[in-house]
């Protein structure tokens, strides 16, 4: 994975497993924001709650970059 810092333009090239460890708090914050957004949608009442986490990780790059409040963003997976 290639991550880039929005402020310093520093680039990290790390494996997914290291990303999960190093950015655990940012991932959790992004997931909670994603979860709240999805559950507030009227149409979500007709869907399965168990698919929330799957859907979040399926589009991890977009969700982390848009729902997370981090100085880092995923440039490429």
What feature does the model see in each segment?
Residues 1-6:
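A short beta-strand micro-motif
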Residues 7-9, 51:
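Glycine-centered tight beta-turn/hairpin loop motif at sheet-sheet or coil-to-beta transitions
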Residues 14-77:
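Acidic, low-complexity, intrinsically disordered interaction modules
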